[in-house]
Amino acid sequence: MAIIHRATITPTMGELLDAWLDSQPWCPDGAVEMLGSYRFDDPAGQVGVEGLVARRSGRLLHVPLTYRDAPLEGGESFLISTMQHSALGERWVYDATGDPVGVRCFVRALRGEQEQAGMELWDGDTLVGRREPTARVYAEPSSPGIAPSAGVAVVAADGIELRLTRVIGTQLNGERQLVAEWADGRGVVAALA
């Protein structure tokens, strides 16, 4: 179960995302519209793993993130930003393609070994409710695709190849694919080759 705290976050997720997306060659300029998000549970309960679905200048984007309470050793090139979280303190936000915990969550989901997490909303030490995710993800057999392009991050892990889309709509090939559905859309966000 993913725990969501009622908190003030600085910089805001929108500010953090804008700054990082501005530096990405696969992302156009413009305002970011958040369409949905989903989470996975880290089995060790230490790292937050979240996938964001957004639109910027008409392009659908998939942004997989991890949240840590300390820097990821060797992960400097994947650090997106740090942020102050009023309930949890300083957090390090990473591109999940460079975080072993995030990569393993996606691999398990693609293999059918891990479902997306439910979300509990906490105010301090009090559980105040549950929140439905704004995007649903599920694994299914893959349909034929084409080779990865600039809109795809390719990660080699444990003898397999994980492909995470950056730009939703980019075709992927692989044995299994992870599909995200949100209020007005659907797209493949990952594949296992």
For each predicted feature, which ranges?
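Short, structured protein-protein interaction patches enriched in aromatics and acidic/basic residues
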Residues: 27-60, 126-134
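Internal, well-folded beta-alpha domain core
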Residues: 66-193
